[in-house]
Amino acid sequence: MLKRYVLILVTITSMLFFSGCGEKEELTVFKEQISNFYTEVSAIETEINAIAEDSENAVSTLLINMEQMSEQFQKLADLEVPAEFVSVEDLADDAASYMYEAVRLYGEAYEDDYVSDSLIQAASYNYESAMKRINYIAILLQGEIPEGAPVIEGDGTEFEPYVEE
């Protein structure tokens, strides 16, 4: 899944780079920031996938990497978005909120050497929701509308974290 994001990023970066000689400074900065985001998230995802489940420090390594990923998502949400990509701003905010909630729930799920399956399920839902929005952002930056994505008129956010009840 992450490889698809990296491929989309390369495509977006190329499109933005070759979009004309008169690129605005704001668009250039945004392009670099998006590229850095995907590079960082890809590196973190690689580290997460390399964790040996039977390792003594697997949980702590996972949680550290998830914290780093959440920080990257927050940086994405804090970016100044050019007018050409204004729809990305709400998606980035939602993605950061979902990732923050996923990290919080994963932390609770593994608290005190007790594993809570329901919290892991809730954390996983929030993680997947964050990644879905990152995919939507990549598609929007290509100038397309994500398939199956709701079209929202006006301002607003749809962040509704899944939490254990």
Language model: regions and residue ranges:
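Sequence-pattern detector for short linear motifs
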Residues: 6-7, 136
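Alpha-helical segments in soluble extracytoplasmic regions
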Residues: 29-164
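Hydrophobic helical h-region of N-terminal Sec-dependent signal peptides
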Residues: 7-15
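Bacterial signal peptide processing site
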Residues: 22-25
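C-terminal motif of bacterial Sec signal peptides marking the signal peptidase cleavage site
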Residues: 16-20
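Positively charged n-region of N-terminal signal peptides that target proteins for export
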Residues: 1-5
